[in-house]
Amino acid sequence: MNDLIMIVIRFLLYLDLMVIFGLPFFQIYGISGVRHETYNLTNFRSFITFAVVTGIILTGINMLLVSNAMSGVTDLRELSIHVIEMVIEETDVGISWIVRLCALFTTLGALFLYTNKRVLSCLLMTMSGGVALATLAWGGHAVMHDGLHYYLHLLSDLTHLGAAGAWTGALVAFAILLMRRNEHNAQSVIVISDSLAKFATAGTVIVVALILSALVNYLYIAEGNLTPLFNSSWGRILLAKTALFVLMLLLAAANRFHLGPRLEVMVREGNYDRSVALMRNSILTEFVVAIIILGAVAWLGMLAPSQVS
């Protein structure tokens, strides 16, 4: 039961911190020159606020669960403040919690600038959100090596986290934009269409970064051995995750090369309702697949390739 709870908390942290980083980041490169008529459409302040508060709570729960596991006590109520302090002060994962909390509170502070200085606010939130997201690397396989390989594997994992966070944040942004049906008009649909076009280039960079960093991570975790893919739970989950990633690529390709251009044409013709609905369904499907992948990632971090099943 404790392992299941830990996996759920890890999953929620992955999703939450990726939104905190990816949503304001998307506003920097994906949404610019917003007109007054569509200002509310692109206002993500309430979503980011909720994510930050949730991230602080989840980090606190994660601190308790990990400290409990390290202390060896069977009941969480037996966990002492002394043990928690020791984990925080003497372990890398403990230090990462403090860094994450500082970054999350910084993000919370940057939200106060959102209304009057949105670009500056999003820039600050992207940086602090990126730091918060990066701390997840110290809770998985990225720190299993020593020396130079420690830093190379960590850099690869940070790249993977950043790229995944950028993609997840963009999906959340598009989902929010497309779900606000009562605010859709010619101007708002133009904002969505333009944002899709801007994400096309960023999406290519994200996919390349994900693939390359995934290969490096696998080489480090499995030591270049293909056997764990087929004789361990870790390998089978990784294969399932890879299949889902391919599905995401197909959906993203459909958005970029078919649904996006079609929406652009329909906007010019003034008949965009059907195209918006199709794009909404595609984005939501892609987002659901992304959520399942994050669940797999949270599970993978609790397993080792050497655990044959």
Curated annotation (Swiss-Prot):
Major localisation: membrane
A Pfam family assignment: CopD
Alphabetized InterPro entries for the sequence: CopC/D, CopD, Cu-R_CopD_dom
GO cellular component, one term: plasma membrane
Membrane-topology annotation of the record: Multi-pass membrane protein
Keywords, comma-separated and alphabetical: Cell inner membrane, Cell membrane, Copper, Membrane, Plasmid, Transmembrane, Transmembrane helix
Segments traversing the membrane: 11-31, 46-66, 93-113, 119-139, 158-178, 202-222, 234-254, 283-303
GO biological process, one term: copper ion transport
Keyword Transmembrane: yes
Family under the similarity heading: Belongs to the CopD family.
NCBIfam families: copper_CopD
The protein, known as: Copper resistance protein D
Organism: Escherichia coli
